[in-house]
Amino acid sequence: LGIDSSQIVNQLTGASNKAAKQATSIFSGMGKKIAAGLSIAAFTKFTKDCLEVGSNVTEVQNVVDTAFKDLSGQADQWASNAMTNFGLSKLSAKKYMGVFGQMSNAMGITGQAALDMAEDVTGLTGDVASFYNRGTDEVYTKLKSIWTGETETLKDLGVVMTQTNLDQYALNNGFGKTTAKMTEQEKVMLRYQYVTSALSNATGDFVKTQDSWANQTRILSLRFEQLKASLGK
């Protein structure tokens, strides 16, 4: 497109960290550069994408507010740092946290415990995606198995969560009983600890490999997504 990529990255970085009003003024300058290299159809699609992302922000926020209630502010603050810590856009982080939180609520896990669990598994989603070079949505879907108990999806991540393995882990880690004698809530907590332990090698991978080409490309894409979210509000 004949656009200075370093200049675009700097503009995207600024836009993703400012309020919607400031993002609009930034877009007025950057948008001219983008528009100069895009067809009318492509620019129309960009505008449509902004509106769709903006709509998703509202829907995701509603789920977060419902799942965490008066703790939703903590969730928002955590998600604001998810890009640099885990390679997740704020929107994706809140989406994952909201769903994980709702699933925990359904199992009787609420309040701070539900939020802590959602943050841990959402962060793990970003790290595992970086470790295995997979899409974050794919990893997010697989990690739902912590709540659902599905085992096949986790094998792609090197986690073999058989009944035998879970029972042995429970006896070795202070649960004092096997899954046959556990409540559904206890089973969720067991799977949570088992999976996070099994994926411990991936923990912190995004930060460790942040300068890699794959992760730098991911960050650029995430900044562009956040710009769309700001413009679409």
Which stretches of residues belong to each language-model region?
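Secreted/periplasmic proteins that engage bacterial cell-wall peptidoglycan
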Residues: 91
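Preference for small-residue-rich
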Residues: 1-57, 225-233
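Small-residue helix-packing and pore-constriction motifs in hydrophobic alpha-helices
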Residues: 35-87, 98-109, 116-129, 138-212, ...
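Intrinsically disordered, low-complexity regions
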Residues: 5-9, 23, 151, 192, ...
